[in-house]
Structure formats: structure tokens, C-alpha cells
């Protein structure tokens, strides 16, 4: 599947690798396709289905392309990792202890089969992402991830080698770390359970990126990660007025 989808219906489609790019072709209409040139790909990111419901190849573009009348800068190919749902409540086995052993064995077999499927899916997607050899494939580091709210809902953000991303819930988030001038950690106060992150870019005409409501437990780890990534950071006890700050920086960048 692809996101965003050029069709109104979601149908499994085919992705082809050509010499100079990637083509997504819908089976519904021959004119329903997405063409992406390798020269226009800024980041090619693979996200495993470990801990997620889908496996993802995400493409972040240098220049937006048109889909219908919409400009898009992110295209994502994904596949659902599981078509099985496991009853995690255990309610189905209540009062059936006589059959419990067999139920457990079935569930164990199901889980093993799902693990096998997920591993095969990860391998397949990773191989596809790497198969053109012209681009470096970035992987997400789940153990370095943290919860935050870049848009309206709480999501799990993860770093790659060069980016900070959120690729599961649209709108997607891709922050290129080399473009970041400074990160401001806002609302860092004793007694508060969370804080906000603001990424200011070297290009002052680019709007800042907010990731709000990050659990305070992630603060020390994120400070260390920013240091490791050579990104300067500063800590503020309040939320700053970024519209005013950015306007003054644009008017007088020096």
C-alpha cells in the first residue's frame, strides 16, 4: 500500500525499481501512479514492524511532487505486519482450564508464526529498499525513541542516523538533523511531568518544528542524544513566542 494514496480505494499495488527512480502503479487505473526520481530523494528510511502493526519504506523528497492538486514531500510504502489478532485478555479461556494447555500451545504457535512472518516481511522490505544501491538506507533506532506530540496525537518518535522521524501516523515527521541550528527544551520545571521540544533550522525562513508533551523521564536521555548528534540545545522554563522570534531573526539574521 502507499500513503498518501492517489486512489480513493486502498488496494495492494506494485512498486517497481527502474534505473533512475521508483514507480508505484495502481491496478485500478493505468494513469494512477507515482514516479519518484532517485535524484529527488533526500532520505530513504526503513522502519521495521517490530513493535508496530506495519513495516515501512519511507521516502522524504528534496522537492515536493504533485499528486492530483496536492504537493507532497513524503511518500510511504507499507504493508500490514499481521492479519491475525490475538485475544490478549485471556477471556476466551476463562473457566476452560481443562483445555488450557492446548489453547496455550495454539497461541504459542500463532505467536511464533507471526514472529516468522514479521521477520520475513522486514527482510523483504529491507532488501527492496537497498536493492538499487544508489541510496543509503537509514534505519530507525527504536531503543532511542520517545513519546511526544508533534501534531495532535501522542506518537512514538525515533532517530535514524541523520533524522528524527515519526512514520506511523500521518502527518509524518522527518527532521533532518544537519539542517537544525539549535533545539530548545521548553517548560522544563521542577514538578512538571512533561516538557516541549522546539527545533530551529539554519534556514530562518523555515518554520520551527514543535514536539510537545515529552515525558520528563526522557529529558536527560534527549540531552545526551542532542550532544551526541552535535546539536546545541538550551533549556527554558517557559514557552517562547516563536512567531515573533523568527520574524526578528528573518529581519536581522546577524
Task: Report the location of each language-model feature.
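N-terminal recruitment modules of adaptor/scaffold proteins
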Residues: 1-34, 48, 56, 60-254
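Classical protein tyrosine phosphatase
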Residues: 53
Amino acid at each position: 500500500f502507499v500513503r498518501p494514496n492517489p486512489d480513493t480505494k486502498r488496494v495492494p499495488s506494485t512498486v517497481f525499481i527502474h534505473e533512475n527512480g521508483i514507480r508505484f502503479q495502481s491496478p485500478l487505473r493505468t494513469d494512477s501512479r507515482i514516479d519518484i526520481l532517485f535524484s529527488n530523494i533526500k532520505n530513504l528510511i526503513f522502519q521495521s514492524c517490530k513493535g508496530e502493526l506495519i513495516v515501512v519504506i519511507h521516502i522524504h523528497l528534496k522537492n515536493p511532487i504533485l499528486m492530483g492538486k496536492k504537493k507532497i514531500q513524503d511518500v510511504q510504502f507499507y504493508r500490514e505486519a499481521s492479519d491475525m489478532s490475538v485475544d490478549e485478555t485471556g477471556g476466551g479461556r476463562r473457566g476452560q482450564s481443562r483445555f488450557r494447555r492446548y489453547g496455550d500451545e495454539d497461541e504459542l504457535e500463532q505467536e511464533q508464526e507471526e514472529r516468522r512472518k514479521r521477520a520475513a516481511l522486514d527482510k523483504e522490505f529491507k532488501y527492496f529498499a537497498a536493492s538499487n544501491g544508489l541510496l543509503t538506507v537509514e534505519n530507525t533506532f527504536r531503543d532511542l525513541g520517545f513519546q511526544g506530540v508533534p501534531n495532535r496525537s501522542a506518537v512514538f518518535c525515533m532517530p535514524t542516523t541523520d533524522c528524527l522521524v515519526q512514520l506511523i501516523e500521518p502527518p509524518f515527521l522527518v527532521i533532518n538533523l544537519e539542517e537544525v541550528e539549535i533545539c530548545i527544551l521548553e517548560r522544563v520545571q521542577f514538578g512538571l511531568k512533561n516538557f516541549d521540544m522546539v527545533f530551529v533550522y539554519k534556514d530562518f525562513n523555515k518554520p520551527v518544528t514543535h514536539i510537545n508533551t515529552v515525558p520528563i523521564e526522557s529529558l536527560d536521555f534527549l540531552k545526551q542524544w542532542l550532544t551526541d548528534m552535535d546539536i546545541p540545545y538550551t533549556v527554558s522554563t517557559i514557552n517562547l513566542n516563536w512567531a515573533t522570534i523568527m520574524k526578528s531573526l528573518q529581519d536581522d539574521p546577524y
